[in-house]
Curated annotation (Swiss-Prot):
The keyword Cell division does not apply. Belongs to the bacterial ribosomal protein bS6 family. The gene is rpsF. GO terms for biological process: translation. The keyword Cell wall biogenesis/degradation does not apply. This is Small ribosomal subunit protein bS6. Binds together with bS18 to 16S ribosomal RNA. GO terms for cellular component: ribonucleoprotein complex; ribosome. InterPro entries: Ribosomal_bS6, Ribosomal_bS6_sf, Ribosomal_S6_plastid/chlpt, Transl_elong_EF1B/ribsomal_bS6. Disulfide bonds: none annotated.
Amino acid sequence: MRNYEITNILREGNVEETKSAVKELLSKYNFTIQGEEDWGSKRLWHPVGQDEQGHFTLIKCSGSPTEVAKIEHEFKLNVNILKTLVIRANG
Protein backbone atom coordinates (compact mmCIF):
# COMPACT_ATOMS: atom_id res chain seq x y z
CA MET A 1 0.00 0.00 0.00
CA ARG A 2 1.29 3.42 -0.96
CA ASN A 3 0.12 6.88 -0.01
CA TYR A 4 -1.34 9.18 -2.65
CA GLU A 5 -2.71 12.69 -2.91
CA ILE A 6 -5.49 13.18 -5.43
CA THR A 7 -6.39 16.71 -6.49
CA ASN A 8 -9.60 17.07 -8.47
CA ILE A 9 -11.20 20.05 -10.16
CA LEU A 10 -14.92 19.45 -10.16
CA ARG A 11 -17.60 21.00 -12.34
CA GLU A 12 -19.74 23.54 -10.49
CA GLY A 13 -23.34 22.62 -9.77
CA ASN A 14 -23.31 19.11 -8.36
CA VAL A 15 -20.16 19.15 -6.28
CA GLU A 16 -21.45 17.04 -3.38
CA GLU A 17 -22.68 14.28 -5.70
CA THR A 18 -19.35 14.20 -7.50
CA LYS A 19 -17.39 14.12 -4.24
CA SER A 20 -19.42 11.14 -3.04
CA ALA A 21 -18.92 9.42 -6.43
CA VAL A 22 -15.15 9.89 -6.06
CA LYS A 23 -15.23 8.36 -2.57
CA GLU A 24 -17.28 5.39 -3.82
CA LEU A 25 -14.82 4.87 -6.66
CA LEU A 26 -11.86 4.88 -4.28
CA SER A 27 -13.54 2.36 -1.98
CA LYS A 28 -14.39 0.20 -5.03
CA TYR A 29 -10.65 -0.14 -5.67
CA ASN A 30 -9.87 -0.73 -1.96
CA PHE A 31 -8.32 2.68 -1.31
CA THR A 32 -8.45 3.98 2.26
CA ILE A 33 -9.20 7.70 2.61
CA GLN A 34 -7.00 9.27 5.29
CA GLY A 35 -7.92 12.91 4.85
CA GLU A 36 -9.92 15.28 2.74
CA GLU A 37 -9.68 19.01 2.07
CA ASP A 38 -12.17 21.21 0.26
CA TRP A 39 -10.41 24.18 -1.33
CA GLY A 40 -13.61 25.74 -2.67
CA SER A 41 -14.47 27.34 -5.98
CA LYS A 42 -11.83 29.19 -7.92
CA ARG A 43 -11.56 30.79 -11.32
CA LEU A 44 -9.56 28.58 -13.68
CA TRP A 45 -6.41 29.92 -15.33
CA HIS A 46 -7.80 28.86 -18.69
CA PRO A 47 -11.25 27.48 -19.52
CA VAL A 48 -11.73 23.72 -19.54
CA GLY A 49 -14.30 23.31 -22.28
CA GLN A 50 -16.90 25.94 -21.41
CA ASP A 51 -16.12 25.96 -17.69
CA GLU A 52 -14.28 28.97 -16.29
CA GLN A 53 -14.86 28.09 -12.61
CA GLY A 54 -13.98 24.87 -10.82
CA HIS A 55 -14.33 23.41 -7.34
CA PHE A 56 -10.99 22.13 -6.02
CA THR A 57 -10.67 19.14 -3.66
CA LEU A 58 -7.75 17.19 -2.22
CA ILE A 59 -7.98 13.61 -0.98
CA LYS A 60 -5.17 11.88 0.88
CA CYS A 61 -5.48 8.12 0.57
CA SER A 62 -3.57 4.87 0.44
CA GLY A 63 -3.94 1.95 -1.91
CA SER A 64 -2.36 -0.43 -4.36
CA PRO A 65 -0.14 1.07 -7.08
CA THR A 66 -1.64 -1.31 -9.65
CA GLU A 67 -5.07 0.31 -9.22
CA VAL A 68 -4.00 3.94 -9.80
CA ALA A 69 -4.27 3.79 -13.60
CA LYS A 70 -7.78 2.31 -13.32
CA ILE A 71 -8.86 5.09 -10.97
CA GLU A 72 -7.43 7.77 -13.26
CA HIS A 73 -9.30 6.22 -16.20
CA GLU A 74 -12.58 6.22 -14.25
CA PHE A 75 -12.01 9.88 -13.31
CA LYS A 76 -11.60 10.75 -17.00
CA LEU A 77 -14.92 9.08 -17.80
CA ASN A 78 -16.79 11.21 -15.25
CA VAL A 79 -18.01 14.38 -16.99
CA ASN A 80 -18.24 16.24 -13.65
CA ILE A 81 -14.48 15.94 -13.04
CA LEU A 82 -12.71 18.56 -15.14
CA LYS A 83 -9.11 17.70 -14.22
CA THR A 84 -7.32 15.21 -11.96
CA LEU A 85 -3.81 14.95 -10.57
CA VAL A 86 -2.70 11.83 -8.70
CA ILE A 87 0.71 11.98 -7.04
CA ARG A 88 2.54 9.56 -4.77
CA ALA A 89 3.04 11.06 -1.32
CA ASN A 90 6.05 10.39 0.85
CA GLY A 91 5.62 8.07 3.77
